[in-house]
Amino acid sequence: DLFMHNFKKVLKTFLVLVVCVALLAALDLALYPCTFMRNDVHAVVTQQFDDIIVGTSHGKMDIDPEVMQEVTGRSGHNLCVGGEYGIDAYYLTKLIKEKQNPKRIIYEVDPGYFVSEKEEGNNYLLFYHEFPFSKAKVEYFWNSIAKCNFRTVLFPWYEYSLSYELPKVKDTFTQKVTGDYDVSHLKSDSQEYHESGFIERYPVDVTKLKKSEPKLYEEGKVNEENMEYLKKLITFCKENDIEFVAVTTPIPINTLKDYSDSYNAAWKYFGQFFEEQGVEYLNFNTQYFKAFTHDLKAYTDYDGHMNGDAAKEYSEVLAQVLESAGQRK
């Protein structure tokens, strides 16, 4: 009788857990939004690409893999996004290597990201949430999400406002259940997402732009963990016979002048770092300064996010520079 009593207790607990898990999964399905990272991760794990571009919002808006392919003949996908740190790029690369066979990683380097800490929560989930089950996902969980607030793990949708989520529940649910990755869902008044992962920003009236201070590099303030993951990524690429190239995209001349001390210190630091690592670093604000315009007209803000037309031109230039750098080796 005691056995039955205990068995029922265990069974009850188990059933409550099952119901909780099912409920959390259902809420996640209905409330966690379909982000462009969902499309990006799906693309890179289900298709083979030669070039994978990782990095920040500058890379996302400035680098169009389809334009690059016309020059290099190499297929590519843009996996950059604002808020992507070294740790994310590292585990994204590990995930892709687990599922496919990338030939080259192009890392877009925004110096400001190396002196700041990655924010908890949403910022990790943006990537982690979209990983299919894999060794990379388990490692990524252990080294990032596990250190976050438990709400992040159990209620990934809690950081998105319900007023934003509720009207979209039906669409979110349908898109996930039917495996719908149509890019038209990701279009807005100011930009559109392309299947290649590139986000095309529509041109803006630059005379109306307001200056705001970008994330700046500060000497002696480098976050060790960020550099650690960048080194890990470079080592991982070397061990797996994946070429690694670092790129810093052009910044408008007004901004370069306003913060010249900070930028000069950053270029020196990263120039030296990549040289020590023995990898190619293409900086479009120093040795390739003249390769592309720094006139504000080509951008949508002082920070250096290009409009779509400029990004297409820049991607062609970047592809040519990559080709000639490859031939020099």
Please state what every model-predicted region is.
Residues 1-3:
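Short, Lys/Arg-enriched N-terminal segments with co-localized hydrophobic residues
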Residues 124-236:
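Secreted/periplasmic serine-hydrolase-like ester/acetyl group-modifying domain
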Residues 52-55, 306:
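Short hydrophobic beta-strand that contains or immediately precedes a catalytic carboxylate
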Residues 32-50:
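Alpha-helical transmembrane signal-anchor/signal-peptide segments
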Residues 234-259:
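Active-site segments of SGNH/GDSL-like serine hydrolases
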Residues 12-30:
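Hydrophobic membrane-insertion alpha-helices, especially the h-region
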Residues 260-329:
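Long, positively charged, glycine-interspersed low-complexity recognition regions
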Residues 54, 58-145:
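Membrane-embedded segments
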